[in-house]
């Protein structure tokens, strides 16, 4: 029986200045009983992975609306591997074309959500995915 709350880092990498979506996700995850660490705006991949390591999170949620996902996500995934944190579940939310989403999944991203995705679906995906890896 695991009574530990799921710990999620919600991050806004890159120069994107819109954080409303990330805050909505963070609130939904908190309301679902998860512990959420929100890093704020303009985070580098290094800052995100270091925060994930320090906070001992099981999940990283990246909110990227700037179109920089093809530059940012591969770097985050490489840093996680470098720090032997490949067991951390990575999800991406934002404006990501289908072909890019497929490439991100090949890099190890667990799921990619478009704007308007169901908060309930995101919560359920995290719960079921973290249970499988716990």
Predicted feature locations:
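Non-catalytic signal-transmission and effector/linker regions of two-component phosphorelay proteins
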Residues: 1-6
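Short hydrophobic segments within beta-strands
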Residues: 9-11
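A glycine- and charged-residue-rich anion-binding loop/surface
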Residues: 14
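Cofactor-cradling patches in redox/metallo enzymes
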Residues: 22-127, 132
């Amino acid at each position: 029986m695991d009574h530990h709350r799921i710990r999620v880092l919600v991050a806004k990498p890159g120069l994107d200045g819109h954080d409303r979506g990330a805050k909505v996700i963070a609130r939904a995850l908190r309301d679902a009983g998860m512990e959420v660490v929100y890093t704020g705006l303009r985070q580098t991949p290094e800052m995100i992975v270091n925060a994930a390591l320090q906070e001992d999170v099981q999940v990283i949620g990246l909110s990227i609306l700037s179109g920089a996902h093809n530059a940012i996500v591969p770097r985050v995934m490489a840093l996680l591997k470098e720090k032997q944190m490949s067991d951390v579940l990575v999800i991406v939310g934002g404006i990501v074309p289908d072909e890019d989403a497929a490439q991100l999944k090949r890099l190890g991203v667990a799921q990619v959500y478009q704007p308007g995705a169901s908060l309930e679906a995101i919560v359920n995906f995290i719960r079921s995915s973290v249970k499988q890896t716990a």
